[in-house]
Amino acid sequence: MWVNYYNESRLELDVELTTHCNARCPQCSRTNEFNVSEKKEWLPLNQVTIDDFKKWFPKIKIKHFHFSGKYGDPGMCKDLKPIVEYIINNSKTTTISINTNGSMRNEEFWFDLCGIGKQRLELIFDVDGINQEMHSFYRRGTSLDKVLKNIEAACQTISKVSVLTVMFKHNEDYIEDIQNMCRKYGVKHFDTVEGNNFLYGPTYKFIDEDGKEQKLEQITRKDREQGLERKDRRVRDHRHDTEYKKIVCAALKLRNLQVSSTGLVIPCCHLSTLEKTIWYKKGKHDEYITTHGNGNINPLIQEYIDRYYDFSLYHKNIDEIVNDEWYSKSIKNSWSSKDTASFACKKVCGIC
């Protein structure tokens, strides 16, 4: 379990440094699909400070930190540079990766950040089109020109710079063109991922900034489809079976845990919806934290919610959290039966 990885200094953490974001991506967990100009009502706006980070990690015993965001972009975190510097200065081998839309700050900021992280830092910029119209149909509120300038600045350093493209029908024929465009700015590493919030069908409707209904469409080219697995992360949508034979936890396989911007240590991003139940007491809870996709909250998840102080880095250290019976035993035991596993565990990590 995770405690073994921590004791061996092999644990990796995905840390959400902020819930602030400059973009309005329709399928993002923070975005109100009925008005993309707004965030979800329940989501608090906060960010991790350098003092928070030092308190959470007085000793750096983590193999890799990944700064991304289910609810925010790490580029919006005011203390991003001092946090990266703290990790570099207080560890010998710990590596860092940062996933960002890149349409904030200026070239000097990203150049300086790479100067701090050097070979131990990877920046992953999101580029979703060959022009502003294509790029911003999904990556709304961002400037492709600004992203490319920031990419070019980062590529002048010894840090690794990558580009990630989220694939939809509107850009699936332009993936090679997007990558060739980015090569001109110095990028050598590329990755793609399907837009994967297509649970009920191949279209995703949302209301744009002008109050008009728009729709994202799922990729149609079979040679682009990535199927059930992508780098050991399971992707579920309407195309895939719902029955499974066993649960193989992708987060455990990757030696990974999530840390929210409020300091909660959570097994994976799919279970991060339990934060809504903790911080926002009204409204319907997410199906992922139930047992069968509806009804009451899964008992194991309810225990986490009731005891959330025990999983908060403001109250416990990471060593105590991964040694807690909930992490060391209970969650694994829950995977043995459809009647005890959470809906998220079955839906996302159930092998057909």
Spans of model-derived segments:
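Processing junctions and N-termini across compartments
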Residues: 15, 19-22, 243, 339, ...
